[in-house]
């Protein structure tokens, strides 16, 4: 689907950065059918020209080596959880498309490098190691039969995480080596789309929450604590349904995945954590995204464990945060589009 929004007067009182020039829309490349409606609405309200580019029906001609001047830039919003919606092929196609765009000099936000980290939890841990940042002890496997041997030296419980994840897809906890062995023998270990997975020590969360830190333009914009319920690994902030005070979030419950047990609150991490998150984003080429970390309840150790180039803003953000991050995102996109010549 393609949509070029009409140029219209801005509906906001406060001053904003310069929008993209008329006739040079911002291309939003995406797959999920609903996650970006709030972004589209904000762009339309601001009169910012944009184009919807749906990954599933997209094609490109690799012989076209000159930069496409019909759009100012491309904002990659491809989701690694696409394979849960029968769009797994879109993921690998996107790698080729982003590489093609960047080879021809097109400005891409969250380009090929960012997306490679997005779709590889193994690469994320290697990045954390290169930055000297702590992460849970892990092993990388590509055969389920190797899971038990790979767990040697790890403290149980462990989790097996598919390399290509998204919204906690396929993450399974095993409380003992025997339980892991039985699952491997019965073919119950999910290695995910690329048949690569982590065997990773399970970290019990101090305070019962994890923390997600968001960046726009590679800089800290906000952070939230997400309070866990049971052993859920699906922590998409756009799907969380209530604040820590129990207030329902009206925009939070998609039809297919209500998570009414999850609670969220705004939180500002220590300066050293914010700096570490910004270092991760810069090293991974993630300009808009998020980083998740957890505090081990056993010893108070902080561990970073997930980088997200596609990180959805928390539902009903003005109520939770006190401001609308989509406004900040659109200002960033407009400024970047205005810098393209």
For the regions a language model picked out, list residue spans one by one.
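Short glycine-rich anion-binding loops that position phosphate/pyrophosphate groups of nucleotides
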Residues: 79-83, 164-165, 310
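Protein kinase-like catalytic core scaffold
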Residues: 158, 221-222, 289, 301-305
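Active-site nucleotide/adenylate-binding loops and adjacent lid/helix of ATP-dependent enzymes
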Residues: 2, 8-22, 27, 98-99, ...
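Conserved N-proximal alpha/beta basic substrate-recognition cap immediately N-terminal to
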Residues: 31-137
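C-terminal active-site "lid" helix and adjoining low-complexity regulatory extension at the edge
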Residues: 264-268, 272, 282-286, 295-341
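Phosphate-binding site of ATP-dependent enzymes
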Residues: 172-281
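Short, surface-exposed charged micro-motifs
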Residues: 212, 292-294
